[in-house]
């Protein structure tokens, strides 16, 4: 597939290069933006998009129909309960979903069971280092016994605006800070797990997956600027060194590709 070269992914066999009509799963499609972008990115693909929310799926279906996109099918489904319904995908994408599960590794393992050998998977996970300030704010919210309602969210946000504490000032720089719904997702989400690069390396190994590369070109340029020209951009130990020297490079998420071997 042409995408492999464009994204500078390191894959280990010829399987992907010979796929003419890739079957793709979007696990946690939300309101459909992700699935529609993927459907347009891969030539002659068939996309299966799942989400737990009926409201999100209804919106996604409506927008997909409005845009005349014909190669996406939407289903309500739980990531942990897919094996009896779906199987044999060439590509699986799940960004911003696994870290909100009670057991993210179980969710990741469930997706991995649906991926064909040689297939690739894009995963998005929160960085522990990049979200240190988020953790401190969430701790305060818990201590103050605030609830995810409009009044408490506005009250906490106003407190932050008038604060000189570093973890508060860092939060103000987030584009999510100026929308109540985004602040709710950012700070009041009940369940959230964070990860480190060494932890991701260990999980990949346990699931029989190999790291193929990060998805963000800007982050790749940071790597190239820090290390020598001959440094291995697919070496997660070097990426860990880079993140330790710049804690906020994965402030959105770790978004990376891996391959089932």
Ranges and model annotations:
Residues 1-23, 37, 41:
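Conserved alpha-helix/loop element of class I SAM-dependent methyltransferases that forms part
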Residues 53:
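Conserved SAM/SAH-binding beta-strand->alpha-helix loop
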Residues 60-61:
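Conserved SAM-binding loop
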Residues 68-80:
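Conserved SAM-binding strand-loop segment of SAM-dependent methyltransferases
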Residues 83-92:
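A short acidic, Gly/Pro-enriched loop at the edge of an enzyme's catalytic core
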Residues 105-117:
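A short glycine-rich, Lys/Arg-flanked "PGG" loop and its adjoining helix->strand segment in the class I
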Residues 120-168:
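Conserved class I S-adenosyl-L-methionine
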Residues 162-261:
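Rossmann-like AdoMet/SAM-dependent catalytic core
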């Amino acid at each position: 597939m042409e995408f492999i070269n464009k994204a500078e992914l390191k894959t280990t066999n010829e399987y992907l290069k010979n796929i003419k009509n890739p079957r793709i799963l979007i696990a946690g499609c939300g309101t459909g933006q992700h699935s529609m972008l993927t459907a347009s990115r891969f030539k002659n693909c068939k996309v299966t998009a799942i989400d737990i929310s009926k409201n999100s799926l209804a919106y996604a279906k409506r927008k997909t129909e409005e845009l005349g996109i014909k190669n996406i099918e939407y289903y309500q489904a739980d990531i942990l309960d897919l094996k009896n319904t779906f199987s044999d995908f060439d590509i699986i994408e799940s960004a911003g979903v696994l870290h909100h599960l009670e057991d993210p590794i179980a969710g990741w393992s469930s997706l991995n069971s649906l991926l064909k050998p040689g297939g690739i998977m894009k995963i998005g996970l929160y960085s522990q280092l990049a979200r240190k300030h988020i953790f401190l704010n969430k701790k305060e919210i818990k201590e103050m016994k605030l609830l995810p309602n409009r009044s408490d969210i506005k009250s906490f946000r106003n407190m932050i605006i008038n604060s000189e504490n570093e973890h508060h000032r860092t939060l103000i720089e987030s584009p999510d800070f100026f929308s109540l719904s985004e602040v709710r997702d950012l700070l009041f989400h009940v369940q959230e797990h964070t990860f480190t690069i060494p932890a991701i390396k260990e999980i990949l190994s346990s699931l029989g997956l190999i790291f193929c590369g990060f998805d963000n070109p800007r982050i790749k340029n940071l790597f190239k600027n820090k290390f020598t020209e001959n440094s291995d951009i697919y070496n997660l130990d070097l990426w860990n060194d880079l993140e330790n020297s710049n804690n906020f490079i994965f402030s959105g998420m770790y978004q990376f590709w891996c391959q089932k071997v």
